[in-house]
Design a protein with these regions (language model features):
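Surface-exposed, interaction-prone regions used to assemble/regulate multi-protein complexes
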Residues: 1-130
């Protein structure tokens, strides 16, 4: 869903961990990622200041996703960009969904909808062919 897409926009949510990211590939493929839990952009330094993290995220605008990885034990999501920077989205929370992703706007899925469920489970909804 995210491979070879470019990060093209962000809507800021009500708190420091709530953001909606938009991705696009060509003229016909859109995807979104709603983050509702902790996240950060990996870099060489270990500073995790909120303003700095948002700036790092914004700096990734228009970069292509080079690699996508889901964690083994929990659905931690890692999007690695062509620059080598990685956006890490936590996939575990005791009571709440950590993130959702789909391939249609607004916040839906034409073919895919993925949800990092409470307790670290991943729900995958796939359109069935008729």
């Amino acid at each position: 869903m995210f491979n070879t897409t470019s990060f093209v926009g962000i809507d800021f949510g009500s708190g420091p961990n709530h953001h909606l990211l938009y991705f696009k590939r060509g003229n016909d493929h859109e995807a979104w990622l709603s983050i509702e839990g902790p996240w950060h952009v990996h870099t060489a330094d270990a500073v995790f200041d909120e303003a700095l993290q948002l700036q790092r995220l914004i700096d990734l605008r228009r970069e292509r996703v080079h690699q996508v990885r889901l964690g083994d034990g929990h659905p931690h999501l890692e999007l690695t960009f062509e620059s080598g920077h990685t956006l890490f989205v936590n996939g575990f929370h005791e009571q709440y969904e950590s993130w959702q992703a789909g391939d249609a706007r607004p916040l839906g899925g034409d073919q895919y909808l993925l949800v990092a469920m409470p307790q670290g489970e991943l729900a995958v909804f796939v359109e069935e062919e008729a």
